[in-house]
Amino acid sequence: MSKKLFIGSSLLSKEQTGSVEFQISHLTNRVLKLTDHLKFHDKDYSSQRGLLKILGKRKRLLSYLSKTNLTSYETLINKLNIRKLKNR
């Protein structure tokens, strides 16, 4: 899914592309595309490294969102079918 189509299909407006919720949704879209790519190209180590970097960034953003706005965090988790963060 292209970025413009993704922005149009998301619940957020075009002015809110910098919001944490949109960034997490966009990173989730990139994760899905990279995992599909890695199913066919399992020795593409640079893409694996990029996937790990994206997952780390998404994890940090999810942690920030859970601390600042718990209700938005829970609705986003349910909408994107992502597992909740582990509590330490």
UniProtKB/Swiss-Prot annotation:
Pfam families: Ribosomal_S15. This is Small ribosomal subunit protein uS15c. GO terms for molecular function: structural constituent of ribosome. Part of the 30S ribosomal subunit. It is found in: Plastid, Chloroplast. GO terms for biological process: translation. It comes from Physcomitrium patens (Spreading-leaved earth moss). Signal peptide: none annotated. The gene is rps15. GO terms for cellular component: chloroplast; ribonucleoprotein complex; ribosome. Its main location: plastid. Keywords: Chloroplast, Plastid, Ribonucleoprotein, Ribosomal protein. The lineage of its organism: Eukaryota, Viridiplantae, Streptophyta, Embryophyta, Bryophyta. PROSITE patterns: RIBOSOMAL_S15. Belongs to the universal ribosomal protein uS15 family. SUPFAM superfamilies: S15/NS1 RNA-binding domain.
